[in-house]
């Protein structure tokens, strides 16, 4: 009932305001329907490039196993980027995806059952890339998206067992800038990945208490891209 009264009062006030405005215009409201402002729309762009990453990797464990990060340098990606105009008006949007070869892992204070390892994986990153072009040679970028992957190898001498989760997926985001010298572009980005899939099945160490394990990575990236447009 109170909400209904509020709605009625609001509609009444809006009606009074409209009436006052209309009366101030001599009973007629003239609306200019012309739109003379020119909107400059940038053409679509297609980029193909390679990216190298230096990554600071680790795993978040619960309960805490005092895991320490492992830094990796064998990380490479092949990427396709498509920049487009949203509704033919805003030229700030793009989509990027590709294939990545990467390594990540951890060491721990306890090293229970020789769990310390560095994993090798193949991934498919997919992000929405927001961009802002400044002049002819500079572009700022913001990445928001995710990734999926599969762990193909491990440094653990025992290899994978039934408690190791080999499929992976998670969130991916970051930002950076690009230096443009058409048709080539140099991209510099800092990205963060957080896996939403466990590294291990929760019962890997015990059926009495579960172990949760989430890999995460902070990467520093440089890429060389070719602009086809």
Language-model features: locations:
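Short glycine/proline- and aromatic-enriched beta-strand/turn motifs that initiate or cap beta-hairpins
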Residues: 24-83, 225-229
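Short loop/turn motifs that connect adjacent beta-strands in outer-membrane beta-barrel proteins
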Residues: 36-45, 85-93, 133-139, 180-185, ...
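Residues that define the transmembrane beta-barrel architecture of outer-membrane proteins
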Residues: 42-46, 70-76, 118-124, 138, ...
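Predominantly the C-terminal beta-signal and adjacent terminal strand-loop region
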Residues: 43, 168-229
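Membrane-embedded beta-strands of outer-membrane beta-barrel proteins
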Residues: 50, 76-80, 124-128, 142, ...
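Transmembrane beta-barrel strands of outer-membrane/channel proteins
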Residues: 50-56, 97-103, 142-150, 177, ...
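Flexible, solvent-exposed loop segments that connect beta-strands
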Residues: 58-68, 103-120, 150-167, 199-214
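Gram-negative (and chloroplast) outer-membrane scaffold detector with strong preference
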Residues: 78-155, 226
